[in-house]
Amino acid sequence: MTQPAIYLDNNATTRVFPEVVAAMLPYFTEHFGNASSGHGFGAQAGLGLRKARLAVAALIGAASEQEILFTSGGTEANTTAIRSALAVQDGRREIIISAVEHPAILMLAADLEKTEGVRVHRIPVDHLGRLDLAAYRAALSDRVAVASIMWANNRYDLPVPQLAAEAHAAGALFHTDAVQAVGKLPMSLADTEIDMLSLSGHKFHGPKGVGALYLRKGVAFRPLLRGGKQERGRRAGTENVPALVGMGLAAEIVAARMAADLSRIATLRDWLESGILALGGCQRLGDPANRLANTCTLAFDRIDSEAVLTKLARAGIAISTGSACASGAMEPSHVTRAMAVPFTAAHGVVRFSLSADTTAAELSRVLAILPEILAELRPVPVTA
């Protein structure tokens, strides 16, 4: 009898909660109006959007739902934040990013550097993924428009509120790509100096194709998309009401369950990680004291991570070779290189990312199957 598949790639995307799917359906067939319309159908859609905005604001601890600007996802939110900061910070033509940002930030920065003459400071990290704080502070000046530092990577999380305060001391705005962090870390943005934050619904059991940019009240802003007056004139384009309603409900559910879920998930993660490390020939990546509760990233020595992924997939187990946004490349990811993972292990990086759906029985099956796979893939020692 075929066993059910096991999904351990929740940092790439998550299963949409059934309640979320059910909540979205009426907005396709009954409350299908344009939220900008002045009749009853538009009003119903507008109510759905307001409820979603309130839920997202509550999840991240924003001071007001008016600080939430809906977008098509994290990439749009990131691009909007950085381009806006450069536009409103007159005369400041430098930005600060980390060496381990998402490609959406890295490629935008490279484009700004090449085509618009923006100077980009790329701050390195150490072998645990911790930001070089001295280099960050040295890069801050009255020429910097914005510092954009990811809140959590697939392997670690950073002291973002502290970094925001230091950016403000230099007169710079602060943005954080929190796509991997929202729903996995408790947040209270109202108590921080963070100016802008990006999030994406599909990372916390909402639908794909929707996200948001948190924009702190009073922060100067220049829209990226112009045209209609949607999102209080800050983002043109008819809102995807069904998906945004779904993201809002996902935010409600995750916020209500976060403390209990994260505790249970971290316990399962630690058990899985201990079991794999006990097999030998691998090392844990990231700062064990500051990382996402659901994530276990390991580097296997002298083993190709793509081969591990393929063999586990054949057994019905889904994992990732680090980051799904970079998988398929035949070279170590930029994060692996930035963390100076030893050459013999750099091609063996795999990521197990759990969710509230993950069970101990599923992880037991992984631990039962993995030793045989590693034995097949590990080179046979040469004897004299």
UniProtKB/Swiss-Prot annotation:
Root EC class: transferase
Amino-acid positions noted as binding [2Fe-2S] cluster in the UniProt annotation, renumbered to this chain: 325
InterPro entries given in the database record: Aminotrans_V_dom (IPR000192), Aminotrans_V_PyrdxlP_BS (IPR020578), Cysteine_dSase (IPR016454), PyrdxlP-dep_Trfase (IPR015424), PyrdxlP-dep_Trfase_major (IPR015421), PyrdxlP-dep_Trfase_small (IPR015422)
Modified-residue entries (N6-(pyridoxal phosphate)lysine), positions: 203
Pfam family, one: Aminotran_5
GO biological process, one term: nitrogen fixation
GO molecular function: cysteine desulfurase activity; iron-sulfur cluster binding; metal ion binding
Entry EC number(s): 2.8.1.7
Keywords: Iron, Iron-sulfur, Metal-binding, Nitrogen fixation, Pyridoxal phosphate, Transferase
Residues annotated as the enzyme's active site: 325
Known catalytic reactions: (sulfur carrier)-H + L-cysteine = (sulfur carrier)-SH + L-alanine
Binding site for pyridoxal 5'-phosphate: 74-75, 154, 180, 200-202, 238
Keyword field contains 4Fe-4S: no
Obligatory cofactor(s): pyridoxal 5'-phosphate
Similarity field: Belongs to the class-V pyridoxal-phosphate-dependent aminotransferase family. NifS/IscS subfamily.
Subunit structure: Homodimer.
Task performed by this protein: Catalyzes the removal of elemental sulfur atoms from cysteine to produce alanine. Seems to participate in the biosynthesis of the nitrogenase metalloclusters by providing the inorganic sulfur required for the Fe-S core formation.
Protein name, per record: Cysteine desulfurase
Taxonomic source organism: Rhodobacter capsulatus
Gene for this chain: nifS
